[in-house]
Each structure stands twice: as C-alpha cells, then as structure tokens.
C-alpha cells in the first residue's frame, strides 16, 4: 500500500469518527442532555425495559410527572440509573423526585448519595425516556462484560483494516 492510499484510509477513518462525534453532539444539543442515548444495564425496569434495550432521552421538560421513566446520575457513581418517578415534591421552585425500579421491592432512597432523600430535577436528571429499541444495546454490554468478545471484535476490526484493498 502506497503513502497516498494510507493517507486516504486515515482520512476516511477520521471522517467516520468525526461524523459520529458530531452526530452525538447534535443529539445532545437537541435533547438537552449530555447523554441522549443510554443502554439498560440491569433488569430493575422489567417488564417495561429489558437488559440491552437502547433508550432515547429528552430533557427539555420543566417538570416530570409521577409515572414518567427518567434516567438519573448520582454523585460518585458513573453509571446512570433508569427508574420510574414514584413521588414528587416542590421545594422553593425546585422539583424533587423519588424514584423506584418497576422490578424492585423498595424505592431508590438507598441508591441516592448520602443524606440525599430526593433527586433534584434540574441537577440529577439526565433525561426522560421518550423511546426505545429493544436488545440492540446488548452488544455494548457484551463488550464491557466479556473480555474475549471485546478482544475478538478488536482483532476482527484490525484484520479487516489490514486486509482491505481500498
């Protein structure tokens, strides 16, 4: 492979990655969420959502209602949680929410940060679920949980890049 072909391959790869990044940032701005698409990682929301479902989020509502399915993050924890709003309170123009997984026996109070009794709608929520695609996100779960699958995928990608004729 000559230098021109290598540069073309590199630029094509850079174009693909930059296009994906721009699409992600565009979705983030439209949905008003730093993470407009998330994958369900546990069975706590069954039967509504299964592990591996991809959720599409929207964070432009000023208020959530009891029964809405929201995604939130807790300080000190990196994985967002998908649960349903169980109760809401208002405190000095702030909407405070208590959530619970559909498949859980108790509310999420034990999941919240220390001394936190409710979620602050403006600070803790990533977004409200507006749509989903079943099981498509399972690939990301396999990649993160199975080392052999991850390295197998990387190996296949490397081999395809190495042996491509374009």
From Swiss-Prot:
Entry's transmembrane regions: 10-30
A single MF term (Gene Ontology): serine-type endopeptidase activity
InterPro entries the UniProt entry points to: LexA/Signal_pep-like_sf, Pept_S26A_signal_pept_1_Ser-AS, Peptidase_S24_S26A/B/C, Peptidase_S26, Peptidase_S26B
One annotated GO biological process: signal peptide processing
Membrane-protein topology: Single-pass type II membrane protein
Pfam families, A to Z: Peptidase_S24
CC terms in the record's Gene Ontology section: signal peptidase complex
Catalytic activity: Cleavage of hydrophobic, N-terminal signal or leader sequences from secreted and periplasmic proteins
Residue numbers on the Lumenal membrane side: 31-166
Keywords, in A-Z order: Endoplasmic reticulum, Hydrolase, Membrane, Protease, Signal-anchor, Transmembrane, Transmembrane helix
Active site: 44 (charge relay system), 83 (charge relay system), 108 (charge relay system)
Region of interest (C-terminal short (CTS) helix), residue spans: 152-163
Main subcellular location: endoplasmic reticulum
Subcellular location: Endoplasmic reticulum membrane
PROSITE patterns (alphabetical): SPASE_I_1, SPASE_I_3
Topology feature Cytoplasmic, residues: 1-9
Assembly and binders: Component of the signal peptidase complex (SPC) composed of a catalytic subunit SEC11 and three accessory subunits SPC1, SPC2 and SPC3. The complex induces a local thinning of the ER membrane which is used to measure the length of the signal peptide (SP) h-region of protein substrates. This ensures the selectivity of the complex towards h-regions shorter than 18-20 amino acids. SPC associates with the translocon complex.
Function: Catalytic component of the signal peptidase complex (SPC) which catalyzes the cleavage of N-terminal signal sequences from nascent proteins as they are translocated into the lumen of the endoplasmic reticulum. Specifically cleaves N-terminal signal peptides that contain a hydrophobic alpha-helix (h-region) shorter than 18-20 amino acids.
Domain observations: The C-terminal short (CTS) helix is essential for catalytic activity. It may be accommodated as a transmembrane helix in the thinned membrane environment of the complex, similarly to the signal peptide in the complex substrates.
Family to which this protein belongs: Belongs to the peptidase S26B family.
UniProt protein name: Signal peptidase complex catalytic subunit SEC11
Gene it is expressed from: SEC11
